[in-house]
């Protein structure tokens, strides 16, 4: 039973954090495309790790990450207002590079396939 509740809480917090980032944070440094890939709330609801994927050049990524990290207080306050939980979790922003790694692997597989077709 607790597994399902944790999953529902993770999804609800993920949805709200995504809405907050895209609609409510007015930081000009948040210029790159940012997407929330996953949220992991601890069982005691004290911490919420928010995994974000940031697209853009390295400078835009760093600026966007700094903007998100400086907005964690606002994000936490909005989560507390929007999601009905006994404790509002402390938000921890983590960068998720899995999408970029997946794209890199896809490019490698595509180049291998091209090399094999050229050899035949």
Swiss-Prot record:
The lineage of its organism: Bacteria, Bacillati, Bacillota, Clostridia, Eubacteriales. Keywords: Cytoplasm, Ribosome biogenesis. Monomer. Binds 30S ribosomal subunits, but not 50S ribosomal subunits or 70S ribosomes. GO terms for molecular function: ribosomal small subunit binding. It comes from Clostridium botulinum (strain Okra / Type B1). The keyword Zinc does not apply. Belongs to the RbfA family. It is found in: Cytoplasm. It comes from the Bacteria. This is Ribosome-binding factor A.
